[in-house]
Amino acid sequence: MTTSAYVRYTIGDILESFNQPIPFEQPLIETIANSLEANASEIEIILSVDESQTQIEDKNIKIIRRINGFTIIDNGDGFTSQNIDSFTKFKSNLKRKIGCKGVGRFTWLKVFEDIKIESQTTDTYVKFDFNKNFSIDSINTQENFSSKTYTKITFSNVTTTYKRFANPNKKKEKDIDERLIADIKAIKELISTHFLVKFFLIHEREKRNFKIILKIGDESEIITNENITKLNKKEFDILDTTDNSLNPQYYNFELFYNYTTNKNEKFVQSYCSAGRLIAPFTDSVKITSLPSPDINLNMLLASKYFDERTTEERNDFSFSKNDVNKTTVNPIPLNEINEKLKPIIEEILLEKFPKLESDNDKILQECIEERPYLGKYIRQDTSKIKTKAKVLDEAEKAYKKKKMMFVNHFPRC
């Protein structure tokens, strides 16, 4: 295997360096992000389907069509000389300022064996295959002037990590198939949810129009800047107290949120990086129920702080969410961020449900009157949406835990 493009790294080495599982949809997400960053206004995604199961004639076997590849075509800037230079370097710095890690294209090869890239800039035509045997010499460039720029990338041959048959000689081994189900509406929802913040910012801040067309056979779905979810915003700043310079770093955090009334719609509450979902809110700030059961609350917290601290796979933080100690790598632990976030969430809730505070106080008083021996623990309840049953249940748990600690500390003689 050649190493000319990566100096000390082979592509195999790079793929082995990823510590976390790569979701099957990651290449699709990465290429959409790349197209948007290349200023594309129109992105067409043609998803190919494994039709092998349609040949099965047994009516007792449920046929599940799955995605086995896709082609994405955009009208962005094309594969420029800077892009080519960046493509041949592991962890390139080209897009670091917008939260990119410089490794996204390598996650493609965890999912697909073969990737074909074709592109036209204003003055150059580029074509090459990207696979585990890729080298810089594989890139074919030709001078070609054109007013029409585009990039076309085709993904095929799913790796055995995501699709493989069990070894018949190993009884406990099972078939593996982690490919996306070919449900075009579900895939549209997946993309819309993942890029909820990014789509909103492109539309509101950059004032850009865009259209993403999804196709599976004769089916099609469209995502545009006209039908994206509108979001409200609140923000706060946190000082990096480990920064002892004359001008210590303040990090800005933006909470994007909205209420929806679609019962069938899943609500999203997540930390974000580079406009993309990274990790769900921890339990201390998560809102799982509202005074009105027909309303959902979506919340997405974004910050440069998160942009700088995500894994290479870009699907989690590079620090533990349970860390409470400040370090040079993680100077603002998540618990500190959440403490700043809590009053913002309470403010959002009270704006929507102005009686919430008095209703909560009433529930606490009723709980104390019903079980006065739990008064101390009832008053410690920090839930934002209180119900009598839940408050009493949590207070009972705290009471029993304290009682058990007392018994263990003073054992009977």
Q: Where are the language model's segments positioned?
A:
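Conserved glycine-/histidine-rich ATP-lid loop and adjacent helix of the Bergerat-fold HATPase_c
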Residues: 38, 103-135
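A generic secondary-structure signal for well-formed alpha-helical elements
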Residues: 35, 39, 115-119, 195-199, ...
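Conserved ABC ATPase signature
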Residues: 19, 98-102
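Conserved ATP-binding N-box helix of the HATPase_c
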Residues: 21-55, 104-110
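Charged regulatory segments coupled to nucleotide-binding catalytic modules in large multidomain enzymes
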Residues: 1, 254-413
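Interdomain "switch/hinge" adjacent to the Bergerat
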Residues: 1-7, 41-98, 124, 130-299, ...
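Conserved short strand/loop->alpha-helix "switch" segment adjacent to the catalytic nucleotide/phosphoryl-transfer site
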Residues: 5-30
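Alpha-helical scaffold elements adjacent to nucleotide-binding pockets in ATP/GTP-utilizing enzyme cores
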Residues: 31, 83-87, 107-111, 187-190, ...
